[in-house]
């Protein structure tokens, strides 16, 4: 059966070569006589898998030596609750910049554990733009400033790293990590659920400047303590080994493809095709996001009415273009163009958009 183009926002499309390698190695892996999902996470064989995944991720993202890397079970929402527990001292505030749905989720998760303050909120403008950093109201002694680098639902993306002075900048990079070069040294911490650009759902990556692990009060429960996870090489408890293995395969694939510089080029080309189809449609397709902050990863757009939205989703699925229905919070259509989406997928979508407009416009 021919694989369709999967535009799902997450879990998202994975490289076919990675899936086929995982398929081939599922029953018996690397000559050990058992599947990778059956061997001990503390065996020499799996420890080598884990070490290779970290080494390749460090190479892919140019992670400085003074930053620790954690591979954690669960997703970004869990991390959002753990950030204040690990990095905010009692009575200390933390600043949040709200640029979409996931920014709102981040502050909601943190609020029970820290004085979570809104430094800027783009909701008053309909989440169509990102307030400039110079306009943010930052607390001078804040534990950190939190941003969402790319909003998958509303389709806005920080195109430059904001300047926050000496305050640690924390960022949710779940949907844009490894999509272009990133100067990690400008951040105190970045994190990402794997299920968009790094691999399957169920595992996340946390990259943190080591000195930050030492300066704040620690959670009472060791399992929530990031310093403990770093000290135990992300194996404080049994990790999701299959997910970790697949993440490692995906990261290695990205390196083999040319790394983040190459994916930046590809992603710009893919986004240009879809935005070009929107902007050239004379209003039949609408994306209202300020062009300077349009997401390259997630492109939401709307047709003239909801009936056409539904017809677009139905006909596109029949044409082999999957998961284009917009998020329930906003409706419309959404195309996610993560690293594993080939240029041919973006071109097929742009062609379909033109054809659909010709027939229904």
Curated annotation (Swiss-Prot):
Cofactor: record remark: Binds 1 pyridoxal phosphate per subunit.
Principal localisation: cytoplasm
Cellular compartments annotated: Cytoplasm
GO biological process, one term: L-serine biosynthetic process
Residues with N6-(pyridoxal phosphate)lysine modification: 196
GO cellular component: cytoplasm
Key words of the record: Amino-acid biosynthesis, Aminotransferase, Cytoplasm, Pyridoxal phosphate, Pyridoxine biosynthesis, Serine biosynthesis, Transferase
Catalyzed chemical reaction(s): O-phospho-L-serine + 2-oxoglutarate = 3-phosphooxypyruvate + L-glutamate; 4-(phosphooxy)-L-threonine + 2-oxoglutarate = (R)-3-hydroxy-2-oxo-4-phosphooxybutanoate + L-glutamate
Keyword Ribonucleoprotein: no
Pathway: Amino-acid biosynthesis; L-serine biosynthesis; L-serine from 3-phospho-D-glycerate: step 2/3; Cofactor biosynthesis; pyridoxine 5'-phosphate biosynthesis; pyridoxine 5'-phosphate from D-erythrose 4-phosphate: step 3/5
Domain of life: Bacteria
Residues that hold L-glutamate according to the record: 42
Residues bound to pyridoxal 5'-phosphate: 76-77, 102, 152, 172, 195, 237-238
Cofactors required: pyridoxal 5'-phosphate
Gene Ontology MF annotations: O-phospho-L-serine:2-oxoglutarate aminotransferase activity; pyridoxal phosphate binding
EC number in record: 2.6.1.52
Role according to the record: Catalyzes the reversible conversion of 3-phosphohydroxypyruvate to phosphoserine and of 3-hydroxy-2-oxo-4-phosphonooxybutanoate to phosphohydroxythreonine.
PANTHER family with a match to the protein in the record: PHOSPHOSERINE AMINOTRANSFERASE (PTHR43247:SF1)
Subunit structure: Homodimer.
Family classification: Belongs to the class-V pyridoxal-phosphate-dependent aminotransferase family. SerC subfamily.
Name of the protein in its database record: Phosphoserine aminotransferase
Source species: Xanthomonas oryzae pv. oryzae (strain KACC10331 / KXO85)
């Amino acid at each position: 059966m021919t694989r369709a183009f999967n535009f799902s926002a997450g879990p998202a499309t994975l490289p076919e070569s990675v899936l086929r390698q995982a398929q081939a190695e599922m029953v018996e892996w690397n000559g050990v006589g058992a599947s990778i999902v059956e061997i001990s996470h503390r065996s020499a064989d799996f420890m080598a898998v884990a070490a290779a995944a970290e080494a390749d991720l460090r190479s892919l993202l140019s992670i400085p030596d003074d930053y620790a890397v954690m591979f954690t079970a669960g997703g970004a929402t869990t991390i959002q609750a753990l950030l204040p527990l690990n990095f905010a001292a009692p009575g200390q505030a933390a600043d949040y910049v709200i640029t979409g749905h996931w920014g709102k989720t981040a502050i909601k998760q943190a609020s029970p554990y820290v004085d979570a303050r809104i430094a800027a909120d783009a909701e008053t403008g309909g989440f169509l733009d990102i307030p400039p950093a110079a306009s943010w109201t930052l607390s001078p002694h804040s534990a950190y400033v939190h941003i969402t680098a790319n909003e998958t639902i509303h389709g806005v993306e920080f195109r430059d790293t904001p300047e926050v002075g000496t305050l640690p900048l924390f960022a949710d990079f779940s949907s844009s990590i490894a999509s272009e070069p990133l100067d990690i040294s400008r951040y105190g911490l970045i994190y990402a659920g794997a299920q968009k650009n790094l691999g399957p759902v169920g595992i996340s990556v946390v990259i943190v400047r080591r000195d930050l692990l030492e300066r704040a009060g620690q959670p009472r429960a060791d399992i929530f303590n990031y310093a403990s996870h770093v000290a135990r090489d992300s194996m404080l408890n049994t990790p999701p080994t299959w997910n970790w293995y697949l993440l490692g395969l995906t990261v290695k694939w990205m390196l083999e493809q040319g790394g983040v510089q190459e994916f930046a080029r590809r992603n710009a080309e893919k986004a240009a095709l879809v935005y070009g189809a929107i902007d050239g449609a004379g209003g039949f397709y609408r994306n209202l996001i300020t062009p300077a902050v349009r997401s390259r990863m997630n492109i939401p757009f709307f047709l003239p009415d909801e009936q056409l939205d539904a017809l677009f989703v139905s006909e596109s699925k029949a044409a082999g273009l999957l998961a284009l229905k917009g998020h329930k919070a906003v409706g419309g259509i959404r195309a996610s163009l993560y690293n594993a989406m080939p240029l041919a997928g973006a071109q097929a979508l742009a062609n379909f958009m033109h054809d659909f407009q010709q027939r229904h416009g």
